[in-house]
Design a protein with these regions (language model features):
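Bacterial N-terminal signal peptides that target proteins for export
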Residues: 5, 9, 22-34
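A secondary-structure micro-motif
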Residues: 25, 47-48
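Bacterial N-terminal signal peptides
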Residues: 33-44
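N-terminal basic, Ser/Thr-rich segments that initiate or prime the first beta/alpha elements at protein or domain
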Residues: 12
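Transmembrane beta-barrel domains of Gram-negative outer membranes and organellar outer membranes
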Residues: 49-212, 218-306
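Cationic, low-complexity basic patches in intrinsically disordered or flexible, solvent-exposed regions
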Residues: 16
């Protein structure tokens, strides 16, 4: 199309003036107008895509505006019910350091493929016949990889879908013992009326096990995150339900379970330190704990984009 337009415009510029060619000139001038409009459109499409990407640029906290590269160091502390001696229930404490790397690929204007990988290292004090004193044990947890395809419908609205694959690298002590697949779907709606960096970002995941140790519990639960992010002055922000901690369990019951629902109050507060780094703190406490995912959860995240 660009070659055709260029050839047509050149022909108009070099043709001799002739009154008998008035009708032809009119058609040629129309061609010039059409070519100019097409040229503007061709330049605008990638510019619009880049504007959408740049407007949501962040230090890694926005799922639908991923930076090109992200390294995250995530430290987490949580307690949850676990099996104790003689059928009792005890609180098991788990400390996690998660090493995460993300990479985003611009596939086409307004299309992004976001890739992610996680390698958790755990310390926990479960009760077992091999650990009757509940000493802390240390090891690698279940590693995972994730791919999500994101499409910007407009500067305000984006949608995405993908999946996460979790491998049972944590063994009996630090993992589920199961291969898991987790389909993901979500959307993002910018709330510019509040602030330029505010948005509503709900997403759903479904965690399901499909292979692994047959003696371990089968996993099948819906995970919900109705994320609301409020951008604050001086690069601060607060997010409500930033993690998919709302759970509905359809799989085998876990220790202490009396129903299917886990509903916490979960929030995160953070600040961008500079153009490429951010630090945040997250706290989750149960409201409804029929399906006891945790008694308390805290996270400190450091993000570095590059």
């Amino acid at each position: 199309m660009r070659r055709l337009c260029g050839a047509r415009i050149a022909a108009v510029l070099v043709q001799p003036a002739d009154a008998g060619l008035a009708m032809s000139e009119t058609r040629d001038h129309s061609w010039i107008g059409i070519c100019l409009i097409l040229a503007v459109m061709l330049q605008t499409i990638p510019a619009f895509s880049q504007e959408v990407r740049d407007q949501g640029s962040n230090a890694g906290e926005d799922f639908f505006r991923p930076p090109t590269n992200l390294f995250q160091l995530n430290t987490q502390y949580r307690t949850a019910p676990g099996s104790g001696p003689n059928g009792t229930i005890v609180n098991v404490t788990t400390g996690t350091i998660d090493f995460r790397y993300d990479h985003a690929l611009d596939l086409a204007p307004m299309w992004i493929l976001a890739l992610r990988s996680d390698l958790p290292v755990l310390a926990k004090n479960p009760f077992s016949s091999d650990n009757p004193d509940r000493n802390y044990l240390y090891g690698v947890g279940d590693a995972d990889v994730q791919a999500v395809l994101i499409h910007d419908l407009s500067q305000r609205l984006a949608v995405g879908f993908g999946a996460r694959l979790i491998a049972p690298t944590g063994g009996d002590t630090f993992g589920s013992g199961k291969w898991q697949v987790m389909p993901i779907v979500g959307a993002r709606y910018a709330l510019w009326e509040i602030s330029p960096s505010s948005y509503l970002e709900p997403f759903l995941r479904y965690d399901a096990s499909f292979a692994g140790d047959p003696t371990r519990k089968n996993i099948s639960n819906l995970q919900i995150a109705p994320t609301l992010n409020i951008g604050l002055p001086d690069e601060w922000y607060v997010s409500f339900y930033p993690s998919a901690d709302i759970r509905i369990n359809f799989g085998d019951p876990i220790t202490g379970q009396t129903g299917r629902l886990f509903l916490p109050f979960d929030f995160r507060v953070g600040r961008k330190l500079d153009d490429g780094a951010a630090l945040s703190f997250e706290l989750g406490v149960p409201i409804i704990k029929d399906y006891p995912v945790y008694n308390i959860k805290t996270q400190v995240r450091f993000n570095q984009t590059f």
